[in-house]
Amino acid sequence: MDNQQDKVIAASANGENNLINGVKENDSEEQDVAMKSFAALEASTPIQPIPVVQKESPMFPRGLLPLPSKKPCMQSPPSPLGLIEAPDHSATGASVNAISLTSGVAKGLNTWSLPNECEKAPFAIMEPAGISALNGDCLMQPSRTCLGCFMESKEAVDPEPGISLKVGDLNRDYETCAVSDIGIQCINAGENLKYGEQLLSDQLLGFPLHKSRAGDRRESEKPDIDLEDPTQKSYYEALLLDKCNTEEALLANSNQDWGYFETFISESKIELLDLCSKNELSVNLFSEEDVENYMFDDDESTLGSDVCSLKIRYESFQDNVRDKTTLLMQEDAQFNFFPSVFTTCPKRESKSGVLKQSSDLSQFKVPDVSIIWGDEDKNLDKKKGKEEVHEDKSIEKKDEKDNGEKPALNNKPCSGLEVEQFKNLKPDHLTNSLETSGNFSDDSSFIEVSYDAMGEIKDCSRYMARDTNSGSSSSQQNYGLRAKRKVRYSEDYLYDVDSLEGEKVNERKEWPPGGSKEEDDDEWCPKKRRKVTRKEPPVIIKYIIINRFKGEKNMLVKLGKVDASETTVNLSESQLSKYAKLSPLKGFWQKKKKQKNGNTDSVKTPFCQKQSFEPGSFEVSFLPPARKRKSKLGNRHRIQRIQSMEASASSKQVSFGSDQKQASNRKEEGGLKGTPKSALLAAPSSANGSHLRGLIGPDSAKVKAQDTEFKGPERKVLNKIKFKSEARLKSKKIKTGQENKPVVQMSPVSEDPSSKANLKNEVTPGTSNSSHMSEFHETKVVKNSTFLPTTCSSEMPLSSANVATNIPVIPGGYLQTLLDASDLSNNTSISYFTNHSAEQNEASLSQTEKAFAPLQSAQDCVLSSSSDSQLQQSSQNFKMEASNYGSLWPDKDTSGSQEFMTEVSGEIATSQSSEFEATQVVSMENNLTAITYSPVCLNSGGSGCNKVLYASVQDSHLAPDDSYQLCHFNNGEICFPFQQGPISTEDDGQLFSFDSMTPLSVSSSSYCPLSLKSCEKDGDDDINDDFLAHCSPKLVIQQSIDEIAPLKESTDLLDISNFTPDKFRHSSLSEMSPPDTPSLSPQSTRCESIKTLGTMKGFQEGVPGSLSSMEKIKWDCSTLSQQVQADDGFTLNNHQFQFHMFNDEDSVGLLQKNPCLSTFDEPAGQISANNKVSKSRKKTSPGKSGAVSQSSSQKNTRKKSPKASNKGVEKPPSKTSRQVPKSAKKGKYVAAVNGEKMQIGIGHSGGQPNSTSSNGKTLTECIQHGGPVAPMKIPSQKGLSGDWALGKESRPGWNDMSVVTNTNNLLDDDQREFQEPSYILSNIASGMADVQRFMMASMEPLWEPMEHQGESNTFYSPDSNSLKLKTLKILAGTPQESKKKINNGSSGATKNHRSIKAVSKSSGKAAVGDPGHADVSGSSEDSRSAFFDKKYSNMNTLGNNGPTHKKLYRHKSSSKTLRDEKYKGKRVEREQIHKDEAGTTCFEKLRGSSYNLLKAETAFGVLPVFEEETHIFQKDI
């Protein structure tokens, strides 16, 4: 109440001022009342006192104001009642003036907290002393939000009509306005309202005041137009005071008021800025240091940031202002601006004794302000004296200032001069106060008052602080409050505050306030520093700018001193050279860069040359940048194929040994696979490519290499050209191929030697002696005996490269690759196959040639249906010939392969790994069979030939294995044939080759059609589906995307694979456009299979270590192949799972199962279910008890997984049973158990059991394939991580099983993916990791293709053929033992991979459910594992055996969760039903999960059966 009393004193002083100004005592009393009311209003709204001041100021000279100031000095201690009563009389303008000053002081008072009190208290008390006028602030309190309430009551009491009108107008305005509005609007509505309100309202508020206020403003303006400058000054003072009052009033409810005021400030911010910009005063204020002060003031409260002070303070002010009243807050804001100006000016004025701010204010209200300020100073001093007392409670400064301010106020008001000085100061001070709200310097008492008033309400102090920043209205009271606040506000006020405070303190002689100001100064000084610091950013910016131009990385400039004495320079050559040395031109660095690049290229070129690729082509494939280029991925794949093929051809031409060395070196250097791939690649290159490249190989290889070279640096342009160049090469190769084809055919028709000679002489290096290839293989095996799988893998890449060369895989799209493959199929492809055939025999070559004749048309048709039928016929012919060819070829090739295998075996030190050694070095027995794939690859060379070889291999596994091995190596050159061959000794191998090659076939277009045709021999429907799907945009695109995605960078793999599988899944394959597929599929497929095979081979070579990577790559290849196959085989499945298509292809690939495959395609559901059930039963029956028990074990524990692995594999999981059936059973069981246990979450701990399982599965597959898988399984159990060994074996040995398993895995995994969100996440993670691995593999596809061919063919075949072969073997007519073995091995592999996936996922359940967990645990897991091992083998390491992309995508659909649930149920059912029921349940649930949409029946026809079997195996395991 002391503050209120001070306000009352100020009000009474104002009342006397009114009298002095010639206004009646009553008027003065009324004015006092008005002052009170205004003080109250000011407490709520800074503007109100100003209107009164405007009127009063004109009425009485400044000189009178000091007297009233003295009078308030006398009335300094009025009681709150007096204050309350006084407002009735202070309704007069003089009172208002006093109040405006008072309200500044009263602002510190609890005017708002005393609203009722104000109304209750008679104004009469205030009337005589004018102290009541200060309590007029309290009168505002009746309606804290509306001064109008107070003004109304005051107006009712107001005897002075003139003032009463003004006050009444204010009251009306107040009624209209909220407290905030009252503060600004109502006060503006006061006598000062017209000018100040209009000015502030229009400028600050950006909107007119209330009509009542406008009317009052007009009324006051009419009599006081001349006084507008003083009035404005007083108005601004009032604004300041009002802000103080408003703050005070608001401070009564400081939280509300301040928040409201702050909100108002933010709201009025823009308006205030507009007004300030519009207002002359505001312009001056803003233009001057005041702007900074204001900025700093407002910023002080808000951010305390000098740079942002203006804006921030303005924002803060407006936030508060609009909360309170837009007008009030805007006025406050303007006063914040003004206070900055005023504060700055008063500080200056303090020094000069003139109100510089008054000058600024005087623009509108300098005289009035001076008078009012003097008066107000008195009133404020008195008020502050009281407010000080009141405020002392809140703040030390307040106390300090109160003590000093009271005497200062009392003294100042008492002495007219001092009052006048203070008056001058006061406007300044108010201005300063507003700005110095934190400053107590100018008017310590006033600051005290505001501080005290604010002190009463600590929120007020906070509010005042904000107000100081936000608005100047809180200047006086806020000053008191901001005395401390000012320290904080000093940030904003910084400079102004210090200077103002110093000046104000000196001028006002507010010693205690000076002390408080010193405190402020102390704080302010640091804030000044802060402000100075804020000005540093330009320096920072400068440095930033400078840093920008510090120079480029390579902008090395040799600074040389130029002879300044040389006024003229002769630009002679010597001088130019000198200057050139001083500052070499861009050309110099360009040359350097070119040289550097040339060196790099030369370094890279040897790698390419090592594989006999064109440096550019090979370079592009191997260059990490090329890999990193997603857009170049397809090209890289194509390049890889081309380079591999060229390398194969070149190697073959040059010398198998040297090329082999180069290839292996290059592969070792360039690829993950390293030497193994190189060896494999070189071997096929030498064997297949020597003459082939001599004839077609060199031409196509060179052309392709050139294209690829172009493509490397100009890949985009070349990509555009690639179709043309591919077509051109295709035409060439078609012609050459046709020419060579007859030669090749004639050569094969001729005896092998002549045929070989012809082939060697001609462009059909494929027809080159199988002995030659065997020699090379042997040489390479001898050289890389340990790396024989690598040799196979290298050959695989070379096979792909040769296929690319033969099918000059121009950087063009997949179609051109297909076309080139078609041409090369007839020409180079035959040569490749012929190389395989060469190893196999000339008859096989002839068969291959025959196959290629249809194949060429088929591939020329880009896998057209007629081509497909041709391929079928060709495959049939080849198959028919295959028997002969198999007999011939197995004899020769087997011998050659066996020699090779023997050497390899010696090298690898595995019993029968020679043939399969390409696939797995560790287990030579079964691997020997796998290695015999190479002859199969000859048949693979002609898809029919591969089929025949497969038939032969099926018939005689060992011999076919030899052929298979040759096929491996030949596939090294022709990724597909080898894959076909090695994938399944039976048709599975071919189907695998088809599937694996399907991408590769797509790459080397003839192979895919050939493979498809080969597969389609037995099942035209499947082949048509596969072929059509393969040829169809869906299949092609899917293959290309799936294949390319893995080959692309990890991002590409993830992006393309993730998006493509889902895209293919969700969009029918037909929706995919073949053009996309051509560009992606050939390269990705081939590269992927090459990479995968190469990786597999590398892993197989170093089975334990490499196998993991190999398996990953293998799985990737399988995934790609399977996806391609899924496209080919099942559009729906491909849609769901690209591997479904591969399943069909696998079915097609399985020659033995081809009838079933055809049946599968047509009555796929029935036959698949039946076959799957029977197969799963068969698989289960071989180790049914083990499978069932292992199923329990799987679920129960991983312990049983090892047991089951031992069971399935022979008891030692690490020791692969040599007995193929037992191994197969064990592999199956182990795979199931391992997969199951891995699914259980045992992860890789059962890796060796999984390894055993994988080995067993692989062995089973190998046995089925003629024993190549068994050695693989053995090596897996021996040293290969079970999963990886199985992955390798599963891929090569898996062909049937892997296809089936992949099919089931696709479905099951997809469903499981839907079923298990965690599995999805795990799949995503593992998929990404696998993608990266696959990317790594895809980074080295050049040598990988060889490996791919050597062993990866098996892997890739397991990718494609695993699903289909397994499906076909399970469903189709594959021998039960083979089926069982394949399924078992596949299941083991699948489970291993799934187990790995489960481990990675740390979700055994997910792993178990990965395949969709059909009760066909064996088949489902085989399918799934094969699939996962293939596609997710890379991801499998991460723990995702399922289709990474699908998982990544399919997890998007809720169906995966459903599938997870279903899968869980299925698992239970599976365990319960184990076989048919499980398979049926899985099938049903898979359908239920809408996994297979359109082709679900077809795909599930195969897949559910496999799932059933897989599930059975899982359970059995």
Curated annotation (Swiss-Prot):
Basic and acidic residues biased stretches: 381-405
Pfam families: DUF4683
GO terms of biological process kind: negative regulation of cell adhesion mediated by integrin; negative regulation of cell-cell adhesion mediated by cadherin; negative regulation of cell-matrix adhesion; negative regulation of neuron migration; nervous system development
Region described as Disordered: 381-416, 505-529, 644-697, 732-775, 1065-1084, 1161-1228, 1372-1422
Compositionally biased spans, kind Polar residues: 644-663, 764-773
Origin: domain of life: Eukaryota
UniProt keyword annotations, A-Z: Cytoplasm, Developmental protein, Neurogenesis, Nucleus, Transcription, Transcription regulation
Intrachain disulfide bonds: none
UniProt-annotated location(s): Nucleus; Cytoplasm
Low complexity bias (residue ranges): 678-687
Listed InterPro entries: DUF4683 (IPR032757), Nexmif (IPR042794)
GO cellular component assignments: cytoplasm; nucleus
Reported function: Involved in neurite outgrowth by regulating cell-cell adhesion via the N-cadherin signaling pathway. May act by regulating expression of protein-coding genes, such as N-cadherins and integrin beta-1 (ITGB1).
Name used for this protein in its record: Neurite extension and migration factor
Origin organism lineage: Eukaryota, Metazoa, Chordata, Craniata, Vertebrata
